[in-house]
Amino acid sequence: MIDAKSEHKIAPWKIEEVNALKELLKSTSIIALIDMMEVPAVQLQEIRDKIRDQMTLKMSRNTLMKRAIEEVAEETGNPEFAKLADYLDKGAAIIATEMNPFKLFKTLDESKSPAPVKGGATAPCDIEVKAGSTGMPPGPFLSELKAVGIPAAIDKGKIGIKEDKVVIKEGEVVSQKLAVVLSALGIKPVTVGLNVLGVYEDGVIYTESELRIDEEEFIGKIQKAYTSAFNLSVNAVIPTSATVETIVQKAFNDAKAVSVESAFVTDKTADAILGKAYAQMIAVAGLASDDALDEELKEKISSGAAAPVEEAPVEEKKEEKKEEAAPAAGLGMLF
């Protein structure tokens, strides 16, 4: 905090700026520090227009932002907030918003735009010039293309590039001449935008590496975790609002299977038990000699006839709900 003794030594505009920054820092629950040092003025204005309704962006000197952060941390008794000042770097600015850190990062990332590479900068990737017409009339630009190693000639009254050409490799320094030519050709190999330095929320500071996630992979992991939890709940018979219906249905089907296998007759399993017994009878009869069989059995064996086996009734769920409320009383009570 600026004390009375030192206040007169500090320029009034600095005091006002720190107070304005403090007010901004206290205005929302999410505070981010961003790097905007390499963002050209035109792109910066475009970005500000895109995010204006979702967040407040304020630029200031790093020293003043540091002081404001530390004073807010002291005034609110929140030492964790003071650590945000450690992320101040380069041409930093403050963003105040109620948007959660991951959505904020995605919004800023999507607001980035392509831009020409500057002379003296490092090539972010291999930069290739494609063959074809430049649309420019004959003139000095032809010599400029050749000067940076791009094969060019006049074609149908326009300057044309003869073949595809990689003019610089990733990591190499771009010369001023090449930067001018690439810009004239409309080649924008650089992506510019607001880069996240740190985002504060509820005592936690997130960095870019933590906020950059693969959404499809993340959703896939959540779906896999849900499926595993669902299966565990069903197999361990731990009812939840999401699994109780499946658990009851599984218990019903298991009980029905036991009833059929043990020939425990109920109104729901009688047809299945009789059908199974009939099929077994036909199978055994098929092993016997013809002398031991009457004509009816012989006919059924020769035609492959078998009694129909009852399929699971469609209205099982209704039965399950009725039985769920009833006390357990042996297999018969489940049907």
From Swiss-Prot:
CDD domains: Ribosomal_P0_L10e. GO terms for molecular function: large ribosomal subunit rRNA binding; structural constituent of ribosome. Residues 314-325 have a biased composition (Basic and acidic residues). The keyword Ribonucleoprotein applies. Forms part of the ribosomal stalk, playing a central role in the interaction of the ribosome with GTP-bound translation factors. This is Large ribosomal subunit protein uL10. It comes from Methanococcus maripaludis (strain C6 / ATCC BAA-1332). The keyword Hydrolase does not apply. InterPro entries: Ribosomal_protein_uL10, Ribosomal_uL10, Ribosomal_uL10-like_insert, Ribosomal_uL10-like_insert_sf, Ribosomal_uL10-like_sf, Ribosomal_uL10_arc. Residues 304-335 are annotated as: Disordered. Part of the 50S ribosomal subunit. Forms part of the ribosomal stalk which helps the ribosome interact with GTP-bound translation factors. Forms a heptameric L10(L12)2(L12)2(L12)2 complex, where L10 forms an elongated spine to which the L12 dimers bind in a sequential fashion. HAMAP family: Ribosomal_uL10_arch (MF_00280). Keywords: Ribonucleoprotein, Ribosomal protein, RNA-binding, rRNA-binding. It comes from the Archaea. GO terms for cellular component: cytosolic large ribosomal subunit. GO terms for biological process: cytoplasmic translation; ribosomal large subunit assembly. Pfam families: Ribosomal_L10 (PF00466), RL10P_insert (PF17777). Belongs to the universal ribosomal protein uL10 family.
